[in-house]
Swiss-Prot record:
This is Tryptophan synthase alpha chain. The keyword Lyase applies. It comes from Roseiflexus castenholzii (strain DSM 13941 / HLO8). Keywords: Amino-acid biosynthesis, Aromatic amino acid biosynthesis, Lyase, Tryptophan biosynthesis. Tetramer of two alpha and two beta chains. Belongs to the TrpA family. It catalyses: (1S,2R)-1-C-(indol-3-yl)glycerol 3-phosphate + L-serine = D-glyceraldehyde 3-phosphate + L-tryptophan + H2O. GO terms for molecular function: tryptophan synthase activity. The alpha subunit is responsible for the aldol cleavage of indoleglycerol phosphate to indole and glyceraldehyde 3-phosphate.
Length: 261
C-alpha cells in the first residue's frame, strides 16, 4: 500500500477528513518549506501539496502566481524542489508529499528521470494540471515504474466519459476542483459541490479530495461531509504573505490548527 493510500485508509478509519496544505517551494524564502512543513505536520496537516514554481502557472490565481514569481526570484528550480523533499524526509516529515508542477519543466527534465529522482527523494506522487489523460501515457508509465501516484484533476465541467478516462489512469486520489476558473480563496463553497462529487464517485473508488477556494474550518468540515480530503492553498499562502518575516511559520501553523478544528 502506498503512503497516500495508507494515509487515507487510516483517516477513514478514524472518521477524519484529510487536510492537505499547499506550500510553494522557495516561498517566501528559498528554504522556508524546511521549517514550514514540519510545523504544519505538527499542527495537523495529513498530506502536503508542494508547488514547483513556474513562470506561467495557468491554473493558479494571483496569490499563488505571486508566490511562484517570488520562488523563481529566489533561484528555485525543479532540482531544488527534489532536494527539498529529500531534506524533509531526513528531518522526519512522514506525511505524503505530492509535488504539483506544470508539464514543460517536467518534460525538459525527462519523465523517467523525474519519476526516479522524485521517488528517491521521498515524494509520493505527481500533480500536473496541464497534462491531459490523452497525453499521459509516458508519465503514467514512469510513475508506475517508480511507485509514484499520478494525480489528475476533474472539474464540474468535465463530461462523464472524460471522468471515466481520467479515473482509469489515476491513482492515489482524484483532485476535484470545487469551482470553475483559477485557484483562490472564496468565502463560500459552490452549492453544486455534493452533486458533482457524487457524479465523480460513480466512476472510481479512489478518495476524492477537493481543492480551489477552501479557506476556513467551516469549508473543511463541509467538504468532509462529501469527500475524503480538502486542499487549502491560496488561503494559506495569504497567511504567509501577510506575516512578518520572523512570524510566518508560527502563523501558518496556527492557521492549520484552526482549519483542523
Amino acid at each position: 500500500m502506498s503512503r497516500i493510500a495508507d494515509t487515507f485508509a487510516r483517516l477513514r478509519a478514524a472518521g477524519r477528513t484529510a487536510l492537505m496544505p499547499y506550500l510553494m517551494t522557495g516561498y517566501p524564502e528559498r528554504d522556508s518549506v524546511l521549517d514550514l512543513a514540519p510545523a504544519l505536520e505538527d499542527a495537523g496537516a495529513d498530506l502536503f501539496e508542494l508547488g514547483v514554481p513556474f513562470s506561467d502557472p495557468l491554473a493558479d490565481g494571483a496569490t499563488i502566481q505571486r508566490a511562484s514569481e517570488r520562488a523563481l526570484a529566489n533561484g528555485v528550480r525543479l532540482e531544488h524542489c527534489i532536494a527539498t523533499i529529500a531534506v524533509l524526509r531526513e528531518r522526519g516529515v512522514r506525511a505524503p508529499i505530492v509535488p504539483m508542477g506544470y508539464y514543460n519543466p517536467f518534460l525538459q527534465y525527462g519523465l523517467a528521470r523525474l519519476a526516479r529522482d522524485m521517488a528517491a527523494a521521498g515524494a509520493d506522487g505527481l500533480i500536473i494540471p496541464d497534462l491531459p489523460p490523452e497525453e499521459a501515457q509516458e508519465c503514467h508509465a514512469a510513475c508506475r515504474e517508480y511507485g509514484l501516484d499520478l494525480i489528475f484533476f476533474v472539474a464540474p465541467t468535465t463530461p462523464d466519459e472524460r471522468i471515466a478516462r481520467i479515473t482509469a489512469l489515476a491513482s492515489g486520489f482524484i483532485y476535484c476542483v470545487s469551482l470553475t476558473g483559477v485557484t483562490g480563496a472564496r468565502r463560500e463553497l459552490w452549492s453544486g459541490l455534493p452533486a458533482f462529487l457524487e457524479r465523480v464517485r460513480r466512476h472510481t473508488t479512489l478518495p476524492l479530495v477537493v481543492g480551489f477556494g477552501i479557506s476556513s474550518a467551516d469549508h473543511v468540515r463541509e467538504v468532509g461531509r462529501h469527500a475524503a480530503g480538502a486542499i487549502v492553498a491560496s488561503a494559506l499562502i495569504n497567511v504567509i504573505e501577510q506575516s512578518h518575516p520572523g512570524e510566518y511559520v508560527a502563523r501558518a501553523a496556527e492557521f492549520v490548527r484552526l482549519l483542523r478544528g
